[in-house]
Amino acid sequence: MPSTKALARRFLEETEHHDRLAAYDGLCTEDYREHDPAMPEETVDLAGARRIYQEVLTAFALRHTPESLIAEDDLVASRFTVRGRHVGAYQGFPPSGLTFEVGGQVTLRFVDRRIAEAWFNWDFDGALEQLRPPAAA
């Protein structure tokens, strides 16, 4: 049986791919809640998280790299790096092909070996700053 740390790593690595968004269903509880102040809706349920990630993954080719994972009781905390490339329209901005790399943290709460709640905090503004086209000379 995988540890909660292994499940957390799988969650971070698999939910970055369009064809693996179903990972939410297998890894999360039905009453899952996600908190992310960088997103348009700061707190969303499972369907909302999938909808937001679908929009983000249409605009960005992403790769999450968990840098560290610490587990205690029903919680797993991770420090991660997100790398991405702007490949599709996002919030009115056409795809630029530009890349970004930012850091973040997440704390996941498990119930019966499934993720019930996630608190994300990552440098979304830093990512958008890196995606701005260079200023005209």
Give residue spans per PLM region.
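C-terminal and inter-domain tail/linker signature
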Residues: M1-A137
